[in-house]
Amino acid sequence: LPFAEGGQGAVFRGYLGGEIVCLKKISMVGVPALKRTKMLSSFKTELGIMIRLRHPRTVQVLGVVTTNPTFLGLVMEYLPGGSLRHALDRDDEVITPEYQRFWTADVALGMAHLYSCKIEHRDLKTHNVLLTHDGRCKVTDFGLSRCEELKTFTTTATMRDSVAGTPAFMAPELFEDNTFTEKSDVYSYAVVLWEIYDRGIPWAGLKPQQILYKLIKEQRLDVPKSMPRDLSSLMERAWAQDPDARPSFADICKELQATTPRRPSSISRPWSASSPTAGDAPPPASVASGQGSSRS
């Protein structure tokens, strides 16, 4: 059974070389053979880029499963801490200000590295930030947005199955002219900052059309009371209505460098969402590593 599911597919635990890995299955059921061939070609091209992308703040892509006609499989490193969203949702989780600053910097560093490699994310949120055993953040679910054939298919499926909530992370310009730039991901980063300090769901209870109306009218989420002034200033600049007024990820990293600890001074417990068990998922049958097989 999958231990996580999202708009792009279900995620299973598997084994590669004796190590636990994640296998994300992107369903190809119902996709015509010719279209599947085009999607596979696009997938392989981007896979090479993603495998070469190595950074402490991004999830490592290890390979791909291409032999099963019912799905495309993306093999990635397994992180035991689960998603940042999961940690924020836990009522028993005491999150210190030190960790909060640490996470804001980790996500910015991961995103800055993606853009240094000319890779857009397009779906940045705390669901797509994973935690290591010691509470470090790594950005995941990047890169596939560049696969045009695959993007068209998964976007259609996502809109059909789970459109609710998506606008909460989308920059206002995407509702107007649909022009995506780095600054669009920066807007999403601002919402991640809000999530880290509020621990709530952005625009909870509102329908997509209501969120859209607020964004176009330049309304934003209320600044969390616990948020330090320097970070609330950064957040408000990062979700500015005008994309040109938002900082780049490189600029954000420079700004955060002086106020972020190198690592948390103490770790009260291992960060673990759940304990993996043998049999959650079989080892991938064919893995090609490095090859293309509110404020009113």
Could you describe each region identified by the protein language model?
Residues N68-E77, R85:
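A conserved loop-to-beta-strand element in the N-lobe of protein kinase catalytic cores
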Residues F43, L47-G48:
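Regulatory alphaC helix of protein kinase catalytic domains
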Residues Y115-L131:
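Catalytic-loop of the protein kinase fold
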